[in-house]
Swiss-Prot record:
EC number per UniProt: 7.1.1.2
GO MF annotation: an example: NADH dehydrogenase (ubiquinone) activity
GO cellular component terms given for this protein: mitochondrial inner membrane; respiratory chain complex I
Transmembrane segments: 2-22, 29-49, 61-81
Keyword Electron transport annotated: yes
Keywords annotated in UniProt: Electron transport, Membrane, Mitochondrion, Mitochondrion inner membrane, NAD, Respiratory chain, Translocase, Transmembrane, Transmembrane helix, Transport, Ubiquinone
GO terms (BP aspect): ATP synthesis coupled electron transport
Coiled coil residues, start to end: none
Subunit structure: Core subunit of respiratory chain NADH dehydrogenase (Complex I) which is composed of 45 different subunits.
Keyword Transmembrane attached: yes
Protein name: NADH-ubiquinone oxidoreductase chain 4L
């Protein structure tokens, strides 16, 4: 178990590092965010199954629901920004403009 959890934590750290490095492009940020959610889902599932926490079996499913909602909202925002501006480069956008 420790080597698996270390690998999952490293995957989360790599996705977080990717989010920090490629924050100027929306598509890269969304992919890194999905990687972070996937590693959180995997780690929470392994912890719940190893500790046999019967009351928490629905937590990974709830995490997947939130990840799906986040992905849908992110893709809708990506399509809107791409249609309006022609690219997903975040630094060229002035989001405070009405």
């Amino acid at each position: 178990m420790p080597s698996i959890s270390i690998n999952i934590n490293l995957a989360f750290a790599a996705a977080l590092l990717g989010m920090l490095m490629f924050r100027s492009h929306m598509m890269s940020s969304l992919l890194c965010l999905e990687g972070m959610m996937l590693s959180m889902f995997t780690l929470s599932t392994l912890i719940i199954l190893n500790l046999q926490l019967t009351m928490s079996f629905t937590m990974p499913i709830l995490l997947l629901v939130f990840a799906a909602c986040e992905a849908a909202i992110g893709l809708a925002l990506l399509v809107t920004v791409s249609n309006n501006y022609g690219l997903d480069y975040i630094q060229n956008l002035n989001l405070l403009q009405c």
